[in-house]
Amino acid sequence: MPKSVKFAAPHLLQARLQLWRSRFMFALLFVAFSALCIKAFYLQTASKPFLQAQGAQRYEKTIELQANRGRILDRHGVVLASSLPARSIWAYADRVDLSDPRLMDLARLLGMNPQDLQAKLTHGDRSFVFLKRQVDLDTAERIAALRIHGIGQDSEYKRNYPEGEIAAHLVGFTDLAHVGQEGLELAFQSTLAGKPGSRRVVRDGSGRIISDIDQIKEPQDGRDLKLTIDSRIQYQAFQAVKEAVAAQQAKAGAAVVLDARNGQILALANWPSYNPADRRTLNGNGLRNRAITDLYEPGSTLKVFTAALALDSGRYSPSSLFDAREGFMKIGPDVIRDAHRNKELLTLQQVIQKSSNIGTAKMALSMPPEDHWKMLDAVGIGQAPRIGFPGAAAGRLRPYTKWKPIEHATISYGHGLSVSLLQMARAYTIFAGGGEVLPAQLIIPEEERRVRAIQVSARGGAALGAGFNAPVRGTPVIRPQTAATMRHILEMSAGNKDAVSRAAVPGYRIGGKTGTTKKLEGGRYVKKYVSSFIGMAPMSNPRVIVAVMIDEPGAGKYYGSDIAAPVFARITGEALHTLAVEPDAPFETMISPISPELVVGPGSVPRAPGDVGRVQNVSVPRHTLIPPAKGRPKTSSADEGKPRLAVRQENERPGSGRGGA
């Protein structure tokens, strides 16, 4: 039987632990376990939302689904601004391997140098970073084909402006977030923008979408904006102004074309301009919509309102005489002068035709200042045009209670107040019809568009633009008889020997008034000029009103008859042909006075009563007509492929001078 083996008892087991030590160890373990339980409870309760959000950030993402921004269209449906599909390229910078050779190809496709790309990926402590926004789809597909870990893309839209600088001041532009910054894009931001949708998705480590979490919230697209603009006439006006500014070495220029029947704006052109799709061309000078925001003294173009007030009062007729033979007129300590001294008495009609400051001032001072102010206020002087456009200027027209006699006199011929070109174009609507001032319109209301669309459909698909040409009722300002008389006076004024070959439009009777004013700087007039011409055609039934302004011509001439009248002729001729308006006069004509009694001085030719207002064929400088385009030429050059109205001028002298031409 084997012997039993004795084992030595471990000393540690034989030792008796002190009671306080065992209790301490138990308490320590209890506290540690309790802390773990409390922490677990805290994480499952108070910190649960935070932890879930942090976890979701690593695999969940809410993608904003952009609404398709509404289009901006002209009256015929031609697109002036639209949104095209594009992609935004982004990266999780902490997941991108900076040594990956494919980053060189990525930089090339993004139009960046590799150093700039690496700087974007390493800049700051941000994990998510946009590399480039609004990348075209073809480039985005080639980037996706690189399959670089950590690089992804989202769908978005890129704003497109097919007309470029031609309609830039009208449509404006948006920023990268599709928020309007200028023009109609800014003014109608809420209408055009719509409401974005959303999509919650799960992504993998490379940023690729695995699945959707919730139901997709669809975006609500923005509504289209339809303008009264005719893009063909807009192009013609833009090119005419641009070329005139270059030819006259001017600072800037603008033109407005209105439908004489309803006040709708057919064109609103400015130069200098900018390309809304290329932000590198943006600068303060090019951004200014001068036809609406820039103010100037209208000069002689305002004299017709003084004449209209005089005629409408019943105290004067077109044959009423005014003495301006001295060439100057003292009003207290002040003196006003005519640019050219007149040797004979002037009829009211001749006061406008010869642009006499003295005759106009005498006319105005014979009437109460309140009546004069009410006339100017009624046609919109001193009030911002309500066309829904940002920054439309109100101009300056002091209350008549503060007018001194000299101020009343100077206001009568367009000094001492300020206007915008659009205000003046709208004011001339009282002469185009029955004496009513028409509201200027730029936006075709959506309700009217729906009604017109139904009418067009009922007519079997007639041209959409035709439905918006109906005449509208305005606010009466002068009697219809006065408006008719003023049309004759405007026709005589535009047909005088100073302007016949500059403002004339072959085949059409035109009427209008030139203006030439010095600019006011620091409270004093300086030798910088604004040349203008405002007129309408055809005078048998006015269809368009065209206003032209050239700022600071620098090629030696500055009279409105020299600078602005030819631009008026070109725009008016092309617009009338585009609108298919029938000619109302022979190609070589000069108008006769309104009636035999208005002819003052030797050489008068009496006519039969039935000949009043009839056009007579007489010998005048020939005009060569090159038929203008009915639409915009497809060439992008300003000098090629664009038919134009060419007028050859012979033996012409400048129009009347200071205070108006």
Regions found by a protein language model. Give the residues of each.
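Periplasmic/cell-envelope proteins involved in peptidoglycan metabolism and beta-lactam response
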Residues: 1-279, 295, 370-382, 504, ...
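Beta-lactam-recognizing serine transpeptidase/beta-lactamase-like catalytic domain environment
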Residues: 2-6, 81, 203-216, 255-300, ...
